[in-house]
């Protein structure tokens, strides 16, 4: 299987390129190498001492990234001082900077009903709460509202903020894991 939709390399290629250990070796200056590994009796630093740094066509170095824009960014602000996640490459130019009225809903189903009833319009910021790890059981994936926005062509016109998680296939101004 491919590792990501636009990639030509498989998980087997990733394994032969050094796998997780090679990725961690490339990140050694950015991670806590004194942290224990899953094995419990070694640290990442001890484990990575035996790994030769060998960036290649599958696993790139930090100096030669696959993409200039990161796949994920952590955002902090008054809504989420502890942080939230956005996928910068998935945010349409039209909604990269959006300012509008916040419309707050207590669950995905309520927000979905509001979208379908025409209560959410271009320029609105849809806030869906209580769907994250402290709300819905199991931190479910937000789908109904996002799919409705896409289906109605509002994904390029409406912002969405939620404590839930969302699919890696979603596009638009979606801030999750608040």
Positions of predicted regions on the chain:
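Catalytic or ion-coupling anion/metal-binding cores of large enzyme and transporter domains
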Residues: 2, 6-178
């Amino acid at each position: 299987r491919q590792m990501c939709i636009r990639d030509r390399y498989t998980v087997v290629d990733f394994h032969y390129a050094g796998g997780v250990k090679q990725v961690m070796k490339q990140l050694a200056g950015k991670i806590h190498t004194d942290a224990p590994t899953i094995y419990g009796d070694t640290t990442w630093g001890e484990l990575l001492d035996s790994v030769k740094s060998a960036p290649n066509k599958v696993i790139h170095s930090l100096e030669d990234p696959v993409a200039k824009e990161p796949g994920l960014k952590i955002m902090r602000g008054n809504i989420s001082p502890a942080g939230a996640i956005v996928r910068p490459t998935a945010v349409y130019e039209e909604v990269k900077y959006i300012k509008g009225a916040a419309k707050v809903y207590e669950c995905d189903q309520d927000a979905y009903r509001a979208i379908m009833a025409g209560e959410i319009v271009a320029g609105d910021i849809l806030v869906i709460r209580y769907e994250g790890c402290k709300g819905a059981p199991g931190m479910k994936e937000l789908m109904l509202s996002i799919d409705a926005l896409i289906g109605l062509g509002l994904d390029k016109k409406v912002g969405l903020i939620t404590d839930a998680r969302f699919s890696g296939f979603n596009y638009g101004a979606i801030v999750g894991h608040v």
